[in-house]
Amino acid sequence: MIIPAEKRRRGSRLATAAAVLLFTIGCTATGFALWGNPPPPRPPASAAVSAPSPESVSATPLPEPISVPPTPRVDQVVGPTLTASEPTQINVPAIEVDSVLMQLGQNPDGTVQTPSLDEASPAGWYTGSPTPGAIGPSVIVGHVDSRVQGRAVFYRLGEMRPGDEILVTRADATVAVFVVDGVEEYPKDDFPQFAVYGNTDHAGLRLITCGGEFNEITRTYPDNVVVYASLVSSRAA
């Protein structure tokens, strides 16, 4: 259910960056599964989202906890929000993604867990972030490739453009409808934690996967592709 502004609680859940040492989504991927296939699509500069001077933090060594802005006051919240409910499925028509969502926690080194490389799907919701539709940036991650099926669930994430819809089905039988604000590709060693994980004044969503040219020597992708989206409405599942 959408919460009217006057009923939104001041003490909303802190964004991901407030609680844990997050920096990038792990990009030690298979690569070999894409041999003979073109590299994953990359977002053009025109698809970039504007962010006010985000703080960039090195991925290695582990960064110190970063500071986040105060949780927005009730009268500062922008747009609709939903009561908390865990996500169960994601649908992205523009890139033909329809995936159940697993739950992902945190690795000992502070990085976000990722789905198994042995499967192209599913994507996963990071449980340390708000549920989709709540105030703050909800985080959903997925692989770009896999060991057994080549292209994985977020292989085409770089194709997304502002205005594309993202539909997230939740456990309370509602569908949260998000619209893409922008798409960015960041080097792992210059990842803007504040812009991606910091508190927001609206119900946001981040879709994240690996990106850039696969390095045959290190067997890794050097970048992360991040899709920024905002909640615009909800409906019954």
Locate predicted features:
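Terminal targeting segments of Actinobacterial cell-envelope proteins
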Residues: 1-15, 40-42
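Hydrophobic membrane-insertion alpha-helices, especially the h-region
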Residues: 17-32
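Solvent-exposed, non-transmembrane regions of membrane-associated and secreted proteins
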Residues: 29-159, 170-172, 182-237
